[in-house]
Amino acid sequence: SKGHALLLPKSHAANIYELSDEMAAKAMILAKKMATAMTAALKCDGFNIVQNNGECAGQTVFHFHMHLIF
């Protein structure tokens, strides 16, 4: 990949289920801003957002976060 960014809130939520609606909205707005800037800077055609919830889904860090992978 050309780049990888991590987005996480300062306030604790173990996963998306514990995330407040307000924080979820803020996270997606910031993810869009980051994706727009990184896509332009890295000259990518697209990217992936990864967000795992629960051990069975591969979550190993139990603080909500999203990976933006370019």
Language-model features: locations:
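HIT superfamily nucleotide-processing domains
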Residues: 1-70
